[in-house]
Amino acid sequence: MRCGKSRRFQPALIIALLVFLCSSVAGQDFDVIKNKVKEHVLGNGMKFIVLERPDVPVVSFHTYADVGSAQEVSGITGISHLLEHMAFKGTKTVGTKDFGVEAALLDQMDQLYAQLSREQRAVNPDSAKITALQEQFDKAKKAAHELVKVGEYSDMLDEQGGRGLNAYTNSDATQYITSLPSNRLEFWMAMESDRFLNPVFREFFEERDVVMEERRLGVETQPTGKLVEDFFAVAFKAHPYHHEVIGHMSDLRRITRQDVQEYFRTYYSPSNLTVAIVGDVKAEDVFTMADTYFSRIPSAPKPERLRTEEPEQWGERRVTVEAQAQPMLVVGYHRPDVNSTEDLAFNAMANIFGQGRSSRLYKILVKEKKIAVDAGSFNGWPGKKYPNLFAVYAVPAMNHTSAECMDAIDAELVKLIREPVSQEELGKYKRQTKKGLIDGMKPNSQMAQTLTFNDVVRGDWRKTFDAVKELETITMADVQAVAAKYLAKKNRTIGEIVPEKEGAQQ
């Protein structure tokens, strides 16, 4: 999500910005970089990770909230993503013309909406009462909107030279990013701490409508979106990876501002937040300011890790979406989480098997057999923190079917199980991945993201710098072993988009 006003950067500006945000790590030993990273945990449990890079006067900020759609329960699915939208609406002092008056109107709206919702869902709803309540609600909503300074939070950051303000939610986390000139460090501290200390979820109903429209456009009118939603629901019977980040429409319609406030109090406690700051700063300055600004946020226990585990699958599952759309095939095999000792082998297998035009799947299905226009594989679907899926997909070519693609995929999977990958394939994967790891450390923003991910999900930001050494330990036997262990038919779910049957909509 990009908050505030829409902007389109010209290519030249994008290139300039990337250069501006980059610091070269070429030729530096990873241990040298690792030794420059410092960490500090506030008394309330909030953690700050800092990497000093004085090359250019810019600093990137990455705030990682350890909460995603996997934390949601029935009735509030989609609330993590909705809260991400609400997090840019301002505070008691930012985004309002008169908070005292506005606060009273927001409370009035909450009360009216609760009454309206109860009456609408009553066994015998009173239509006259519903109409009266709706009129009162609309009047309060209009009055509250007139007090809003729309987009003030993002405008204030832009005025201070901010770039790349964004946020996104997935199954595992919600993350907030931006970059500022390095002499605006304290400005960011004041703004970000106020956002978590004094949030005001104004324009809630307007933003909820925006999210509902996202669902309509991305799921309810898109066969691919519908396939993904149904696929997760079938592949995961117990674990909350079974629902999409966007949530169910019936839940979105009924989520209240109080629901969001309660969710925020639970999952945005300081102990559940990790911040990485990379750029032209001094770690001691960062820690001093963090103590001043963020220690104001009251401490609270870190939410308990999810208890529910997905049970072993005992047989192949299938899901079909009928639509007048491009046919598609997706297959998912259950696999362990990112902290498993087998994760490295899974990554190598996904790359060799189905990533890029030189991968096995693409060469066989697209180039040689010409039964697909695209094919590939990937890991970590829909998340990485908990056991997830190794996925394979194919888009059948005209006059060809998903069944043909599935047969060809199965034939290649058998080879993967019975025969080790070649030394050439594994060597190519290691070289490409090593380059990607090094390149990924260049942009300040990407480095900040990697540090927070490794610290929260993998348990220690230092693992960022172990990746290349770990890469070298993968063997051909490791890849063959995970293929043989996990790529069984009884461990998979198959999803398809197929042509809609004649008369289906009549």
Task: Go through each PLM region and give its residues.
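Active-site recognition of the HExxH zinc-binding catalytic motif
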Residues: 77-85, 89
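Bacterial N-terminal signal peptides
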Residues: 12-24
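Bacterial N-terminal signal peptides that target proteins for export
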Residues: 1-14
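Non-catalytic beta-strand/loop surface segments
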Residues: 26-71, 96-183, 205, 217-272, ...
